[in-house]
Design a protein with these regions (language model features):
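Structured, active/binding-site neighborhoods that engage oxygen-rich ligands
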Residues: 1-312
């Protein structure tokens, strides 16, 4: 079994052919000749490289977007990514912030770090509170799964911190769901698909059966399911053939960095009360009792950058 961002990427690849031709069933061929990676994968690699290299995130996103200009970006993001200058964030609450955030969940060593890095990963484009919230909920679900929390505990934590309604059932959602690319209209559904699943593959099948923005919903679900179950090696091997060399390299380097980081599942070490109605301050998600201060986080990122330079 393999755990990591490959789980999110597989969700994107499997869901790619259903984005505009929804399949409201869990019974479908998992991978076909027309399956491909999309903007979800490209942006996931950009965030992974940002975490590894401690680079400017806006430049990472723009660089990766320009490598793959036809990956299927939304209109506002395309305008932002391909402009000659780095434009300010455009107050989006679209699920683009959640689709690219899985590396944060696998990289973070504390719940608070997951919160802060998810916020940073979103706000360069998706600085609307719901856009930030969707990224944080996804990253924190992944972190909690990595920390060994049960599905019940993950559900309770996400409901508590983010206020999502996770009591619905996929069968009920499926009958009424319409295409919704907002965080608030797709992230809760993706999490519910994970909560109802039995293993990694069933999680992806449930996510796609919802309909709507299938590749992104499956990408979000896939990241969480990968952290919780792991991904079967044979499935990783199959999907590997759909990926370009730079995508594979990004995944490999990111995995090497994450393997050296020790996770802490101590929620009590990070006591804070989120308020998504208020403006975000740079240090809002850090308090004096947290396990990792902003300065310590910066020092850690500097160490990782030095490690990567020596490695090359």
């Amino acid at each position: 079994m393999e755990r990591g961002i490959i789980g999110a990427i597989i969700g994107d690849v499997v869901g790619s052919r259903f984005e505009w031709e929804n399949n409201r069933s869990t019974d479908f061929e998992f991978l076909t000749d027309v399956s491909k990676f999309t903007d979800d994968t490209v942006m996931t690699c950009a965030v992974a490289d940002w975490l590894v290299n401690n680079d400017n995130l806006a430049e990472e996103l723009r660089t990766w977007a320009r490598k793959y200009p036809k990956a299927g970006y939304g209109g506002k993001f395309r305008e932002w990514a391909f402009d000659k200058e780095v434009l300010p964030p455009y107050n989006s609450f679209g699920n683009g912030s959640a689709m690219r955030v899985s590396p944060v969940g696998f990289y973070a060593t504390t719940f608070g770090e997951a919160m802060e890095l998810a916020k940073q990963s979103a706000e360069v484009t998706h600085n609307h509170p719901e856009g930030i919230k969707g990224a944080q909920a996804t990253a924190c679900a992944i972190f909690l799964a990595r920390a060994g929390r049960s599905k019940k505990e993950i559900k309770q934590e996400i409901e508590y911190w983010f206020g999502y309604d996770l009591d619905r059932k996929i069968d009920d959602i499926r009958t009424v769901y319409k295409f919704d690319a907002s965080c608030q209209g797709s992230v809760p559904e993706a999490i519910i698909a994970f909560l109802e699943s039995e293993d990694y593959e069933s999680a992806i099948r449930l996510a796609i059966s919802i309909g709507g923005d299938s590749d992104t919903i499956a990408c979000i679900t896939g990241g969480i399911a990968s952290a919780f179950y792991g991904v079967p090696d044979e499935l990783v091997e199959k999907v590997w053939k759909y990926l370009k060399e730079d995508v594979k390299y990004s995944i490999h380097v990111f995995n090497c960095i994450c393997d050296s980081r020790v996770i802490s599942g101590d929620m009590e070490a990070f006591g804070f009360e989120p308020n998504f109605d208020d403006a975000y301050e740079d240090d809002e998600w850090f308090d004096e009792d947290s396990e990792m201060s902003e300065e310590e986080l910066k020092d850690l990122m500097d160490e990782i950058e030095e490690y990567e330079e020596n490695r090359n």
